[in-house]
Every structure is written in C-alpha cells, then in structure tokens.
C-alpha cells in the first residue's frame, strides 16, 4: 500500500513490486523481515532520500509473508499493516500476537513504513505454525479507513475483525460477496471511496 495518489503512488507501487519480484526470483533472501529491510534500502536509494521530512510521505506499508508447505511454518513481517489468522489450533499470545474470539488472531506490524523515517529500526518477524484448514487474511487500510455509516465515520479495525469472524467459516466466494457488499452499504450513496481497497484471503488445504 503506497502513499501518494496518481503518478507518484503508481510509480512507488511499480518500484516496490519490481524489487520484490527480483528478490523472490533471486531466492537469496528467505526472511520477510530481511526482505523488508532490503526493500527499504533499495527504495531510499532509488528515491534519493537523504533525510526524514514530515511533509514528505513517499513510502510503502506492507504485510509480507513466507510459507513453508512442508513444515506449515508462516513467517510474517509488517510495515504498518497487520494480518489476521483464523486457526483451529491455539496460537500463544504475545505483545505482537493478539487473540480474539473463535480462533481469530491479529499479528501486529512494526510501526514504521518502508521508507526513510525518523525510526529506522530493523523489521521484526513473527513465526507461527499453521494447521490444515487455517486461513490468512492480508488487507490494506483502505477498508478500515472508509468513511460511511449514519455518522460518516471510519469503518474501523474492530468492525473489520468482527466481519472476518462472522464470515470465516464460509467459502471464499461467499466471503468475498459479503465483505464487498458490507463496505458498499457502509459507504452508501453519499461517501466516495477514499482509498484503494484490497482484502486477500489464503486458506491451507485440509479440513
């Protein structure tokens, strides 16, 4: 999810996708956190960023995962974007793993973008084991930040988690229909779509 609109945002998206594709095909970096650090270095270099400027928001928010099909291990690193896991197995909670009802967990990101920032810490990584039938949801902030409803407010993270919880046992085609119709009803006839919206679900084969 790149900052900026129009040409600047589109350029940043193309740059990020190209760099991630190069890293994935090179097969030299397997760790999502190291990939984000490499991506940040490459973007800062490509944009010629030399100092942090609060008025310059060129950068990228991203949730990046790798999955080992043999071990069932998911590795996640995030720059401002969390992910949601629906798991039949209990995942131990931590300061970065927040459990919710009915097997839903939110994996929290590092609070910094892929860009030159006032905090340039290393990206951290969460490693969990998934089970057959578990699902992973990745999403940009366009859905939760969409204005609408009777009070013209943001949809919000709590409502989004509740929505995922309510549809998680349905087929993905049914989930897609409900998730889309929900935000359309929320937006109504008076609100414009405020940002790009992406919600992506991945389910492990099995029970």
What are these regions, as identified by a protein language model?
Residues 1, 81, 140-142, 196:
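DG-centered beta-turn motif at the end of beta-strands
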Residues 4:
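Phosphate-binding active sites in nucleotide-utilizing proteins
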Residues 7-88, 123, 188-194, 202:
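Catalytic core of PPM/PP2C metal-dependent serine/threonine phosphatase domains
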Residues 7-28, 124, 130-190:
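Active-site-proximal, acidic helix/loop segment immediately C-terminal to a metal-coordinating Asp/Glu
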Residues 57, 116-122, 181:
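Short gly/ser/thr-rich secondary-structure transition/capping motifs
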Residues 85-91, 118, 147-153:
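Cytochrome P450 core scaffold surrounding the K-helix E-X-X-R motif
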Residues 87-104:
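Short, basic, low-complexity termini and linkers enriched in Ser/Thr/Gly/Pro
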Residues 203-207:
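Intrinsically disordered or compositionally simple regulatory linkers and C-terminal tails
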């Amino acid at each position: 999810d790149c900052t900026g609109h129009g040409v600047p945002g589109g350029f940043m998206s193309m740059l990020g996708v190209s760099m991630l594709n190069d890293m994935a095909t090179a097969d030299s970096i397997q760790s999502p956190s190291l990939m984000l650090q490499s991506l940040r270095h490459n973007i800062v270099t490509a944009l010629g960023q030399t100092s942090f400027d609060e008025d310059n928001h060129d950068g990228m928010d991203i949730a990046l995962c790798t999955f080992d099909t043999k071990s069932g291990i998911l590795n996640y690193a995030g720059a401002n974007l969390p992910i949601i896991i629906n798991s039949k197995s209990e995942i131990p909670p931590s300061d970065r793993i927040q459990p919710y009802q009915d097997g839903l967990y939110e994996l929290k990101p590092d609070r910094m973008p892929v860009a030159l920032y006032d905090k340039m810490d290393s990206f951290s990584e969460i490693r969990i084991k998934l089970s057959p039938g578990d699902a992973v949801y990745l999403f940009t902030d366009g859905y939760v930040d969409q204005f609408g409803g009777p009070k013209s407010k943001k949809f919000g993270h709590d409502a989004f988690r509740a929505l995922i919880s309510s549809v998680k046992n349905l087929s993905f085609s049914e989930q897609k229909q409900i998730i889309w119709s929900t935000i359309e009803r929320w937006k109504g006839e008076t609100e414009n779509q405020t940002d790009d919206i992406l919600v992506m679900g991945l389910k492990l084969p099995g029970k």
